[in-house]
Amino acid sequence: MKIIVINPILFTHEKGVIPHVTTIKETMIYDLCLAYHRAGHAVSLIAAADYAPERKETYDFEVVFLKSIGRKIFQPSVLPFLPGVWRYLQQRKGDVDMVLASETFSIPSLFASLIVPRKTVIWQELGAHNRKMKTWPSRIWYNIIARCFMRKAWIIPRSYVSQRFIRRYMPRVGDPIGHGVVVTLEKEMSNKKSQFLTVGRLFWEKNVISVIRKFDAFLSNRKNIKNGFDIAF
């Protein structure tokens, strides 16, 4: 298959400031594209140029960084506007088999839904309205733009919370799909311990402590298992 993955925001900003990085190969979306590539698919990744690494890299597949415009209104850390996505998709709409885009509340996702509606798959992580400007832009988008112009796209939620949210606005919503695995690890560790680890940045939105508490509650009813576990984050 020929797959185009559109993920303008490659990693989380810090208070609106996009950090400078030396590589994008540690991002979740790069691992996903690499998995497609290793499975024999022809994959291209589109991202905002604001997230390009400081030094030039060699990639296993095509990576296209496109310029964002109107940055004062369409902040690259929140809602980047990449007009080059329209041109890129128009030139390849007859050849591509699937366009995988990030979030329904996204201009590139709208472009994909207009150009190749039946080939567009959108993964939905958000389970609530964006709080910018008292949620009005988000509410207008989901109630009008998404309902009118993005109805034919297939929506894949990342959680049951996001599934319940997006079902209020979109007709074609699938079942949640969880995280995959990192495909670059080539051998298992021989000195493994019974541990439960959560790996990630401690943003309050991620609610990491709830994962720890729920796993601890799960083990509390299984004393024979819990005694062998170290729980930490």
Language-model-detected regions and their locations in the chain:
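A short, active-site helix/loop in glycosyltransferases that binds the activated sugar's phosphate group
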Residues: 49-54, 146-174, 181-185
